[in-house]
Structures are given as structure tokens and as C-alpha cells.
């Protein structure tokens, strides 16, 4: 049972790191976009990655593999990141 728990922790943490770091990478790429369309595309991908990260954080919470206080703040922050990125995409699309 312990080995299974450790394996689940590894899988969840790997997914959170992958999708979480992808947010920043896509925002960075967007800042060097060659066109408005490219900028919107990269920011939209960052928004999708933020939603995926939010999913993995909720899954981590529901699995009870970490303390409640640890994931509550991360989930709240991920919601804020989603709101920010969504607003950037929508505003950029209106201006395009």
C-alpha cells in the first residue's frame, strides 16, 4: 500500500510540475510572439495548462496525499492565474 501511495504521489507531482512549468514557458513565448495571433495562441495554451494544473491540484487534494493547508492556497492561486490568463486572451481577441 505504501508503494502505491508513493507511486501516486510521484505521478501527481510529475503532472503538476509538467503543466505548471508549461504555463510560464508559454507566457514567455507569448512575450516574444511574432504576431498578435501568435501571442493569443500562446496565451491560450498557457490558460489551458493552468486549467490542467488546477485539475491536478484538485486531484491531489481529493487523494488526501498532502495536508489541507498546503493545497488550499495552491488551488486558490491557480484559480487566480486562470482568471488572469483568460482575461488576457479575451481582451487580446477583442483588440485583434
Report residues per predicted region.
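Short, C-terminally biased terminal segments at protein or domain edges
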Residues: 1-29, 33-96
Amino acid at each position: 500500500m505504501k508503494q502505491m501511495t508513493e507511486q501516486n504521489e510521484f505521478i501527481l507531482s510529475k503532472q503538476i510540475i509538467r503543466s505548471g512549468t508549461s504555463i510560464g514557458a508559454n507566457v514567455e513565448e507569448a512575450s516574444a510572439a511574432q504576431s498578435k495571433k501568435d501571442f493569443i495562441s500562446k496565451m491560450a495554451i498557457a490558460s489551458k495548462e493552468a486549467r490542467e494544473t488546477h485539475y491536478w491540484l484538485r486531484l491531489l487534494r481529493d487523494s488526501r496525499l498532502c495536508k489541507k493547508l498546503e493545497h488550499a492556497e495552491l488551488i486558490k492561486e491557480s484559480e487566480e492565474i486562470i482568471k488572469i490568463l483568460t482575461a488576457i486572451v479575451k481582451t487580446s481577441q477583442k483588440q485583434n
